[in-house]
UniProtKB/Swiss-Prot annotation:
Pfam families: Pkinase (PF00069). Catalytic component of a trimeric complex composed of STK11/LKB1, STRAD (STRADA or STRADB) and CAB39/MO25 (CAB39/MO25alpha or CAB39L/MO25beta). One of its GO terms (molecular function) is ATP binding. Keywords: Apoptosis, ATP-binding, Cell cycle, Cytoplasm, DNA damage, Kinase, Magnesium, Manganese, Metal-binding, Nucleotide-binding, Nucleus, Phosphoprotein, Serine/threonine-protein kinase, Transferase, Tumor suppressor. It comes from Gallus gallus. This is Serine/threonine-protein kinase STK11.
Amino acid sequence: MDMQESQQLGMFGESELMSVGMDTFIHRIDSTEVIYQPRRKRAKLIGKYLMGDLLGEGSYGKVKEMLDSETLCRRAVKILKKKKLRRIPNGEANVKKEIQLLRRLRHKNVIQLVDVLYNEEKQKMYMVMEYCVCGMQEMLDSVPEKRFPVFQAHGYFCQLIDGLEYLHSQGIVHKDIKPGNLLLTTNGTLKISDLGVAEALHPFAEDDTCRTSQGSPAFQPPEIANGLDTFSGFKVDIWSAGVTLYNITTGLYPFEGDNIYKLFENIGKGDFTIPEDCGPPLSDLLRGMLEYDPAKRFSIQQIRQHNWFRKKHAQAETLVPIPPSPETKDKWRSMTAVPYLEDLHGYNEDEDDDLYDIEDDIIYTQDFTVPGQVPEEEAGQNGQSRGRGLPKAICMNGTEPGQLSTKSKAERRASASSNPSRKACSASSKIRKLSTCKQQ
């Protein structure tokens, strides 16, 4: 701006200067006048699923909420990055194992795998699961006592035994039963989750002998703490369920230590005490499940026949409720995908690119495996590739993985912008699908 222009501008009043042009001046304001608002994320579609907000994060990846645009069912998705899995010992193997196990399990107390989606370009895998509103450990942490009333603990424990009995009937040893791996639905149904370290016994195995364990240290039995080469897999789960019952009824752990070595030393000795307020029936059940000798440790059938298990307990204390969401403080745990769904219904073809993001190269694997991976039970002895009769991985748009476009995301966007009719048609069909589901 030269001297002449500045002199001319000096002749204007403040109100007139404001109307000259916002890009001409930088107006300084007091910091108290600034309203800071978090940037609103755009809606994101992964195949037929509308992405919601973050539910939690673990060592393997993030867990987010999802909405199925066809059924309007609430889902949870575990987002796994291949690069991150490679940095975790047995990371990729554990994920593949969990998918192979979950795809053949159907029980009300075992988490259900709904879909497996794969993005080759981003090297991401999406494990779509049934939605659970809260984890048991989160509920325990929300109260000072860190425990449940006996009535509530009994209800959860009975469901845990139901789910555990089903897993054992399918020849599966979970190996990591603990409150952190037990999820709850909105109606209070318990779901056993996280089968990443589980082991499927051979169909013709003589017994339940196992040789490896990767479970949480505080829930491991003496035979593992003492370093035995082989052990009974089912009795490991019984022990872990016993530690879980001890924890949810007392708020304590039967064995503790300043470090893992001291913890395993205490577990290896097998000496523990039970608070007196537990009462004789519960104390007897805990001693049976936490028996040092695996051969004498309670079986599922003995647990079911125990007086404490069969007794109908009175509701003497207030139940521990599902706590508010730690992220939003929403006590109702409302569906986080709703705001993004509203954005899609406010659709304008001219604002298509600003409305939502779509991951195009999503592969839906019909057999719940990573594209190119042959399930162990279906692989031939000679290691040949998938047979002609086996299901193939297909993309959401109907193409096969080999037919996927190698264009970058920027190139695909440019291609879409050069063909506005195709872009508008694609977006309109997706939103029309959502609108139809909402009306139904």
